[in-house]
Amino acid sequence: VAGLTLGADPLVAGVSLVSALDSRMVNGLIVRKEPKGHGTQAWIEGPLPEKGTKITVLEDVITTGGSAIKAVEKLRDAGYIVNRVVAIVDRQDDCDSCGKGEADTAMRESDLELCSIFKLNELT
């Protein structure tokens, strides 16, 4: 799993921790918004898997999908396969009559499946 810092950091860490407790280690990667200005100057931090590995991107709240797509692009550029984004809450901005929001449209255009645990209207 991977996520764009800072919002996804606790999600990535939580998935990694729970998977380790269940003896099914899932490594977590953090994708930076900008590369560090010192040290490795890397976009992606964490135990890097082999190129070609499938990675799911995690998001806390998704609105337009822009942050998630930025993370996906960096991961794909690094040689990983990303087909899915999982969000805790989908705000469903600019929702159409079919219940699809702006983020869902952006995900489809980037060949991504968007899965969310909650839609904002379910929480209000």
Where are the predicted features?
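A short, small-residue-rich loop immediately preceding and capping a beta-strand
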Residues: A2-L4, T53-D60
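Short, glycine/charge-rich flexible loops or terminal/linker lids adjacent to PRPP-binding catalytic cores
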Residues: L11-T56, G66-K70
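Conserved long hydrophobic alpha-helices within structured protein cores
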Residues: L6-V12, G79
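General beta-strand structural signal in soluble alpha/beta enzymes
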Residues: V1-A2, I30, L114-I117
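Short glycine-rich phosphate-binding loop at a beta-alpha junction
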Residues: V1-G7, V86
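Acidic, glycine-rich active-site loops and adjacent beta-strand->loop/helix elements
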Residues: G7, R32-K36, V89-Q92
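PRPP-dependent phosphoribosyltransferase catalytic core
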Residues: E73-T124
